[in-house]
């Protein structure tokens, strides 16, 4: 059979980063927090993620937050403020702006099916 070669360091970093993002995106919104947990520099983390995935380290955090926000907006009746809080946004205006920046639509409009 074919022997699988050990993952190279780039893939390892990407894997570890992805797992950390899925675990911590609600409280860690900044790449620096992940780099610090992984004991590597921000530039090293960013360039490695870019090479391994053709997306940026920041994009992966944003995608995790937006995916969760969209699911909550569609599946729960919790107030938007609470959804924002659950995702680490203390300020509902900031959550609204973040959501709209990355989706082109407000959380309220998204919830009302205007996508």
Summary of predicted features, one role per range:
Residues 97-115:
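…primarily DNA-binding HTH/wHTH and HhH modules…
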Residues 45, 94-95, 99:
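Short hydrophobic/aromatic patch on the recognition helix
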Residues 1-40, 44, 112-115:
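Inter-domain helical "communication" segments and dimerization helices
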Residues 38, 87-88, 99:
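Core residues of bacterial helix-turn-helix
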Residues 51-93, 112-115:
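Terminal helix-turn-helix DNA-binding modules in bacterial transcription factors
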Residues 1-3, 17-30, 49, 53, ...:
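Basic, amphipathic alpha-helical hairpins
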Residues 28-62, 67:
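Charge-rich, low-complexity intrinsically disordered segments
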């Amino acid at each position: 059979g074919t022997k699988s070669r050990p993952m190279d360091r780039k893939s390892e970093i990407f894997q570890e980063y992805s797992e950390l993002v899925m675990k911590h995106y609600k409280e860690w919104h900044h790449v620096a927090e992940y780099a610090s947990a992984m004991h590597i520099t921000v530039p090293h983390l960013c360039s490695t993620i870019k090479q391994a995935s053709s997306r940026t380290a920041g994009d992966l955090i944003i995608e995790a937050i937006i995916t969760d926000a969209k699911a909550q907006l569609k599946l729960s009746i919790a107030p938007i403020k609470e959804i924002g809080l659950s995702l680490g946004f203390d300020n509902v205006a900031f959550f609204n702006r973040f959501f709209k920046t990355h989706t082109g639509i407000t959380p309220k409009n998204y919830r009302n099916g205007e996508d």
